[in-house]
């Protein structure tokens, strides 16, 4: 593989990496992660459980509770140890939350918790992410054909130009979609249902992958455009050099042709033969000498 093919293959690598990052971010549900403050359930159905409030009632005839039960009620009324922290993570499609035992997760659609007036913006964000993936995939296909095909020509330079345009569009669309999703999530945190609102949250690894894909898109776009510009200038210089060589060859042939014409033309007459006495062949009264060559 020559140097040009190696450079094209190296340019294809970050495109595939950006495509992988975008696909992983879209299908995953770790854009935002955090904890929710959830009220502990009573231990009536879970005797001996660790994540519930323990109490027992006195079965005496007067119906009053013993000292242990009163202590438990005192803790319940003050709110100490009343809540438990549950981890959750949210993506474009669903929101998942840990169960009480911490072994499995309970998921629901993220669209179901977004306020109704903001769901259109959520769909715009999802559409931007999908279009971002389509543009990156198109760029990967174009670069793959650029690497696999060996036919030279200026038309292949247009592939680099298209890749640069598609990748910068993908990066800009991805940036807008990421910012729209961030806005939607923050609005949902403030205006969403009470049984979903997180206490603490931060951005997850899916969000980092999405922005990593954005950075790769811009880097590939700049690299492809610089390659196109350099190749275009080189192609133009070669054309100018070829036109200059043809012009110099044409200018070199013109003096040779003129010289050959002079060599094959009539030789000048000697000075002593320039004038001849033709008086015998002229009518009376005409001059006696004429100049001929």
UniProtKB/Swiss-Prot annotation:
Gene3D superfamilies: 1.20.140.150. Disulfide bonds: none annotated. InterPro entries: GSG-1 (IPR012478), PMP-22/EMP/MP20-like (IPR050579). GO terms for cellular component: plasma membrane. Keywords: Glycoprotein, Membrane, Transmembrane, Transmembrane helix. The keyword Oxidoreductase does not apply. Glycans are attached at residues 59, 67. It is found in: Membrane. The chain crosses the membrane at residues 9-29, 121-141, 161-181, 205-225. It is a multi-pass membrane protein. Residues 1-8, 142-160, 226-293 are cytoplasmic. Residues 30-120, 182-204 are extracellular. Pfam families: GSG-1. Belongs to the GSG1 family. This is Germ cell-specific gene 1-like protein 2.
């Amino acid at each position: 593989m020559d140097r040009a093919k190696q450079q094209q293959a190296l340019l294809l690598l970050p495109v595939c990496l950006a495509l992988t990052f975008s696909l992983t971010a879209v299908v995953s549900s770790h854009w935002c992660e955090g904890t929710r403050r959830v009220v502990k359930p009573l231990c009536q159905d879970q005797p001996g459980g660790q994540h519930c409030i323990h109490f027992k009632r006195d079965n005496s005839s007067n119906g009053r509770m013993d000292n242990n039960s009163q202590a438990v009620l005192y803790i319940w009324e003050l709110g100490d140890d009343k809540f438990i922290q549950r981890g959750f993570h949210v993506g474009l499609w669903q929101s998942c939350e840990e169960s009480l035992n911490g072994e499995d997760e309970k998921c629901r659609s993220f669209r179901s918790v977004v306020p109704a007036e903001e769901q259109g913006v959520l769909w715009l964000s999802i559409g931007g992410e999908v279009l971002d993936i389509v543009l990156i995939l198109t760029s990967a296909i174009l670069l793959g054909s650029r690497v696999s095909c060996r036919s030279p020509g200026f038309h292949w330079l247009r592939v680099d130009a298209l890749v640069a345009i598609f990748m910068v569009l993908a990066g800009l669309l991805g940036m807008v979609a990421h910012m729209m999703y961030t806005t939607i999530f923050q609005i949902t945190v403030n205006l969403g249902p009470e049984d979903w609102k997180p206490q603490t949250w931060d951005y997850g690894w899916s969000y980092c992958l999405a922005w990593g894909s954005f950075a790769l898109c811009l880097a590939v776009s700049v690299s492809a455009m610089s390659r196109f510009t350099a190749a275009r200038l080189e192609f133009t210089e070669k054309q100018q050099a070829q036109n200059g060589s043809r012009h110099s060859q044409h200018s070199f042939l013109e003096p040779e042709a003129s010289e050959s014409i002079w060599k094959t033309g009539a030789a000048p007459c000697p000075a002593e033969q320039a004038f001849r006495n033709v008086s015998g062949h002229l009518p009376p009264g005409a001059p006696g000498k004429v100049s001929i060559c």
